[in-house]
Protein backbone atom coordinates (compact mmCIF):
# COMPACT_ATOMS: atom_id res chain seq x y z
CA UNK A 1 0.00 0.00 0.00
CA UNK A 2 1.07 3.55 -0.62
CA UNK A 3 1.63 5.92 2.27
CA UNK A 4 -1.14 8.31 1.23
CA UNK A 5 -4.68 8.11 -0.12
CA UNK A 6 -6.51 10.81 -2.10
CA UNK A 7 -10.21 10.96 -1.29
CA UNK A 8 -12.79 13.08 -3.15
CA UNK A 9 -16.38 13.66 -2.03
CA UNK A 10 -18.50 13.11 -5.16
CA UNK A 11 -21.98 12.83 -3.61
CA UNK A 12 -23.57 15.28 -1.19
CA UNK A 13 -24.05 14.53 2.50
CA UNK A 14 -27.47 16.25 2.54
CA UNK A 15 -30.12 13.88 3.86
CA UNK A 16 -27.58 11.42 5.27
CA UNK A 17 -27.46 10.29 8.90
CA UNK A 18 -25.49 12.18 11.52
CA UNK A 19 -22.98 9.34 11.77
CA UNK A 20 -22.20 9.62 8.04
CA UNK A 21 -21.80 13.39 8.37
CA UNK A 22 -19.47 12.88 11.35
CA UNK A 23 -17.29 10.47 9.37
CA UNK A 24 -17.07 12.92 6.46
CA UNK A 25 -16.10 15.73 8.84
CA UNK A 26 -13.49 13.43 10.38
CA UNK A 27 -12.02 12.88 6.93
CA UNK A 28 -12.01 16.64 6.30
CA UNK A 29 -14.62 16.47 3.55
CA UNK A 30 -17.12 19.29 3.97
CA UNK A 31 -18.12 20.19 0.40
CA UNK A 32 -18.77 18.27 -2.81
CA UNK A 33 -15.77 17.83 -5.12
CA UNK A 34 -13.33 18.57 -2.29
CA UNK A 35 -10.22 16.39 -2.36
CA UNK A 36 -8.03 15.63 0.64
CA UNK A 37 -4.84 13.62 0.97
CA UNK A 38 -4.75 11.39 4.04
CA UNK A 39 -2.24 8.99 5.56
CA UNK A 40 -3.07 5.40 4.75
CA UNK A 41 -3.94 3.80 8.10
CA UNK A 42 -6.48 1.22 9.26
CA UNK A 43 -8.51 3.98 10.95
CA UNK A 44 -8.75 6.04 7.77
CA UNK A 45 -9.55 2.94 5.70
CA UNK A 46 -12.41 2.10 8.06
CA UNK A 47 -13.84 5.60 7.72
CA UNK A 48 -13.53 5.40 3.92
CA UNK A 49 -15.32 2.02 3.89
CA UNK A 50 -18.21 3.44 5.94
CA UNK A 51 -18.94 6.20 3.39
CA UNK A 52 -17.51 4.62 0.24
CA UNK A 53 -20.80 5.17 -1.63
CA UNK A 54 -20.15 8.94 -1.46
CA UNK A 55 -16.43 8.94 -2.30
CA UNK A 56 -13.89 8.44 -5.06
CA UNK A 57 -10.62 7.01 -3.75
CA UNK A 58 -7.24 7.21 -5.52
CA UNK A 59 -4.40 5.09 -4.16
Swiss-Prot record:
GO terms for cellular component: cytosolic large ribosomal subunit. GO terms for biological process: translation. It holds the Pfam family Ribosomal_L30. One of its GO terms (molecular function) is structural constituent of ribosome. Keywords: Ribonucleoprotein, Ribosomal protein. InterPro entries: Ribo_uL30_ferredoxin-like_sf, Ribosomal_uL30_bac-type, Ribosomal_uL30_ferredoxin-like. The keyword ATP-binding does not apply. PANTHER family: LARGE RIBOSOMAL SUBUNIT PROTEIN UL30M, MITOCHONDRIAL RIBOSOMAL PROTEIN L30. Belongs to the universal ribosomal protein uL30 family. Part of the 50S ribosomal subunit. This is Large ribosomal subunit protein uL30. It comes from Geotalea daltonii (strain DSM 22248 / JCM 15807 / FRC-32) (Geobacter daltonii).
Amino acid sequence: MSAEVKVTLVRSHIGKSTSVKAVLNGLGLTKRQKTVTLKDSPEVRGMINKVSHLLKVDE
